[in-house]
Amino acid sequence: MAPSGSLAVPLAVLVLLLWGAPWTHGRRSNVRVITDENWRELLEGDWMIEFYAPWCPACQNLQPEWESFAEWGEDLEVNIAKVDVTEQPGLSGRFIITALPTIYHCKDGEFRRYQGPRTKKDFINFISDKEWKSIEPVSSWFGPGSVLMSSMSALFQLSMWIRTCHNYFIEDLGLPVWGSYTVFALATLFSGLLLGLCMIFVADCLCPSKRRRPQPYPYPSKKLLSESAQPLKKVEEEQEADEEDVSEEEAESKEGTNKDFPQNAIRQRSLGPSLATDKS
């Protein structure tokens, strides 16, 4: 009897562990993990999403409350999810995550930022009492599905890719820091040149420029020459006529002076002796 009693306790502990293992596993699965591949599931239904980072102390303190809140998800008809921003940088840019942890409520594609107390009871009251209706939803311009936020997501993914390449150059290849920066500078330069050439090619295809043929020099025709020569001839004839009139007037004035000259001289000569006698 003693051996059977001594084996009963270990067997009971083993049964409890085996029975509790799937329970704990199912408990962890209540919180869904959101990635870049399945984030569009948030656009349908009722969701509460937590954005966190493993190194964040506030996020670590929130995890027990979030896990216990997830147990009520089925009763409240709300899906509980979380996003690790260190593994999903695109989603952090898409949702404009500037502080950690950040909690969003989503109802049929309308996103609202939760800014209340971070306890299990407050989360439950927020959903059951529909307190989210008093919060203004995020504008469609800044919604995660907008073109602007999609561009922001791509920018965040590009920055993380550049950081990964930088670490690879330094740690794996052994390049100095300035060598890694030089590689990125050259890559940026060549990519800019290639993008500029592509834009010029597309613009030329969409709006081709009209090629102008060189026009021959407009030589004046004979008619124009004859018509333009006629007023010149008239002007020359008028100038010649004026010159002739001037020359005739000058000639007449000279003749008049020549005729007066001998008469004056005769008078002076005739007056000369008489003046001499008067003086004597």
From Swiss-Prot:
Q: List the disulfide bonds.
A: C56-C59
Where is the catalytic site? C56 (nucleophile), C59 (nucleophile)
Q: Which domain of life is it from?
A: Eukaryota
Nucleotide-binding in keyword set: no
Extracellular membrane side: 27-180
Q: How is it modified after translation?
A: Palmitoylated; palmitoylation is required for localization to mitochondria-associated endoplasmic reticulum membrane (MAM).
Q: Where is the Thioredoxin domain?
A: 27-132
**SUPFAM superfamilies assigned:** Thioredoxin-like
EC identifiers of the protein: 5.3.4.1
Q: Which GO CC annotations does the UniProt entry carry?
A: endomembrane system; endoplasmic reticulum membrane; extracellular region; mitochondria-associated endoplasmic reticulum membrane contact site; mitochondrial membrane
What does the UniProt entry say about where the protein is found?
Answer: Endoplasmic reticulum membrane; Mitochondrion membrane; Secreted
Which parts of this chain are annotated as the region Disordered?
218-280
Give this protein's Gene Ontology molecular function annotations: disulfide oxidoreductase activity; enzyme inhibitor activity; protein disulfide isomerase activity; protein-disulfide reductase activity
Signal peptide stretch: 1-26
Question: TM spans, by residue?
Answer: 181-203
Q: Name the residue ranges with Acidic residues bias.
A: 237-252
Q: Which reaction does it catalyse?
A: Catalyzes the rearrangement of -S-S- bonds in proteins
Sorted alphabetically, which keywords does the UniProt record give? Disulfide bond, Electron transport, Endoplasmic reticulum, Isomerase, Lipoprotein, Membrane, Mitochondrion, Palmitate, Phosphoprotein, Redox-active center, Secreted, Signal, Transmembrane, Transmembrane helix, Transport
Q: Membrane topology for this entry?
A: Single-pass type I membrane protein
Lipid attachment site numbers (S-palmitoyl cysteine): C205, C207
Pfam families hit by this protein: Thioredoxin
- List the Cytoplasmic topological domains: 204-280
Q: What else is known?
A: Mediates reduction of intermolecular disulfide bonds between chain A and B of Ricin toxin (Ricin A chain and Ricin B chain, respectively), thereby releasing and activating Ricin A chain.
Q: Which PANTHER family match?
A: DUMPY: SHORTER THAN WILD-TYPE, THIOREDOXIN-RELATED TRANSMEMBRANE PROTEIN 1
The protein's name is: Thioredoxin-related transmembrane protein 1
Q: Which organism is it from?
A: Homo sapiens (Human)
